[in-house]
């Protein structure tokens, strides 16, 4: 009897690391025989790759589940990612959710769904225990626990800290809107910032083996990639879990020496890892994008201590100024959190003034969100009023806009090499420069090709 090919759609929430996870999952599901749809309304399976960095991220995932279930009641919704790892029971209680799969078991999803139309699963939805408490392969589970018949959502999670290595996540090429593939070479984090839940849902720091990284880059280049973004939860810690240790710098040198990749970009690197050697490496090769993203979080030494950050404002300023001296046209971005418990008006003023004098070119501003299980969620310090947090975030975003405008003006009139993105209008194409400026070139052009773009100060 003929059975139509099962279809799936996928939606991603969160950072570049989750982008990379979603791309790998998409490709694995395609390889398992499922067909990808661009919309959720007609898909047999809908995979939501969740984020849990803030309460708003959790809410966004829950709302997505409700919206998809209303639009497509017959779809089996699979929620995976960081929120699924942190609070699986919470997600499982939502109507429409068939499976909750934590980061610990995310790579098992294709096996879970591959033969859903061609294989009869034993048992009924209520036969099995809803959770697994230890990390186990899906093949080792009772098949009753894999039933996709209607019933309560099943939970597949495990101890994320049981994972001590990182496997290659096959990435998409450059088809569609995925012009600049993200290659995740590191996952997890051994730091314990007081506000951050990510180590508890991503596990300890793990690095992709150098030979595997080189081969993955080669595959992407053969697939047509011109630029690759290296990503990780704590990218600068790459290689510290190996014996003998290696470093991100050494890995980058191998990529430059052993592959034909035309441009490499970094997602985010912590300030203590932006060393003189690291900056010198960027200076030494035109194949590395002139773009640094360095999390700051606060310009107040008091708040940085409370956050359990492992640097102080003076070191951060030193690293940023070092970049600006070595690479005058580099883009330098930062993450900042406002409203951390105990952040006074003076603390915020210190942060604002600190950022104001630094040669940063843009900010990502976040409002503090207490995460269950983190130290900051238990602080005795008085919480900052929501209205105050909103005002502070607005002030920093305005500062970010001013800095971005000033940086763009400093580049006005230059013609810069830029890669075409899969975006544009009827008579223009959007491109991205090495130093993270978007520009428009006349005409409609294929994505993933290099062009010379003139920078205009008044262009968005």
Would you name each region that the model predicts?
Residues 376-460:
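Terminal RNA-binding accessory module
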Residues 77-78, 86-87, 222-345:
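Conserved SAM/AdoMet-binding glycine-rich loop
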Residues 1-231, 236-238, 292, 313-325, ...:
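Proteins enriched for Cys/Gly/acidic motifs involved in redox and nucleic-acid/cofactor modification
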Residues 294, 335, 355, 363, ...:
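Hydrophobic, well-ordered secondary-structure elements that form the walls
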Residues 12, 232, 296-298, 420, ...:
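Flexible glycine-/small-residue-rich
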Residues 34-35, 75, 98, 261-262, ...:
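A structural micro-motif
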Residues 107, 191, 236, 272, ...:
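Glycine-centered loop/turn positions within well-structured domains
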Residues 343, 359-360:
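Contiguous mid-protein beta-loop-alpha structural module that forms a pocket-lining wall or clamp
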């Amino acid at each position: 009897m003929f059975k139509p090919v099962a279809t799936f759609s996928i939606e991603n929430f969160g950072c570049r690391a989750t982008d990379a996870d979603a791309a790998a999952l998409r490709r694995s599901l395609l390889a398992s025989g499922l067909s990808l749809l661009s919309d959720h309304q007609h898909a047999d399976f809908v995979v939501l790759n969740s984020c849990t960095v803030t309460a708003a991220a959790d809410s966004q995932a829950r709302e997505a589940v409700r919206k998809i279930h209303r639009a497509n009641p017959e779809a089996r919704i699979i929620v995976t990612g960081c929120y699924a790892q942190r609070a699986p029971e919470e997600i499982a209680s939502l109507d429409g959710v068939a499976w909750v799969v934590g980061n610990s078991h995310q790579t098992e999803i294709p096996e879970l769904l591959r033969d859903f139309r061609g294989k009869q699963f034993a048992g009924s939805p209520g036969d099995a225990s809803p959770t697994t408490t230890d990390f186990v392969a899906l093949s080792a589970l009772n098949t009753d626990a894999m039933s996709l018949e209607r019933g309560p959502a099943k939970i597949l999670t495990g101890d994320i800290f049981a994972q001590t290595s990182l496997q290659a996540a096959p990435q998409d090429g450059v088809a569609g809107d995925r012009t600049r593939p993200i290659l995740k070479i590191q996952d997890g984090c051994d730091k314990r910032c007081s506000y951050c839940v990510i180590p508890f849902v991503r596990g300890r720091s793990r690095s992709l083996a150098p030979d595997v990284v080189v081969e993955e880059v080669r595959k992407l280049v053969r697939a047509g990639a011109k630029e690759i973004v290296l990503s990780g939860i704590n990218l600068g810690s790459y290689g510290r879990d190996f014996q003998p240790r290696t470093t991100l710098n050494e890995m980058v040198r191998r990529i430059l020496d052993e592959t034909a990749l035309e441009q490499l970009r970094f997602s985010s690197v912590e300030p203590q890892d932006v060393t003189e050697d690291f900056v010198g490496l960027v200076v030494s090769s035109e194949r590395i994008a002139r773009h640094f993203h360095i999390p700051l979080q606060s310009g107040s030494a008091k708040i940085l201590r409370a956050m359990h950050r492992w640097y102080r404002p003076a070191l951060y300023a030193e690293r940023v100024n070092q970049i600006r001296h070595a690479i005058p046209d580099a883009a330098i971005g930062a993450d900042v959190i406002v409203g951390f418990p105990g952040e006074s008006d003076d603390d915020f003023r210190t942060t604002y003034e600190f950022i104001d004098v630094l040669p940063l070119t843009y900010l990502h501003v976040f409002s503090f969100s207490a995460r269950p299980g983190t130290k900051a969620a238990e602080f005795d310090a008085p919480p900052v009023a929501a209205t105050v947090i909103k005002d502070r975030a607005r002030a920093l975003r305005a500062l970010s806009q001013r800095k971005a405008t000033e940086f763009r003006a400093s580049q006005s009139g230059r013609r810069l090499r830029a890669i075409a993105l899969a975006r544009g209008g009827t008579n223009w194409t959007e491109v991205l420069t090495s130093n993270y400026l978007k520009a428009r070139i006349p005409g409609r052009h294929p994505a993933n090709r290099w062009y010379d773009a003139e920078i205009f100060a008044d262009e968005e």
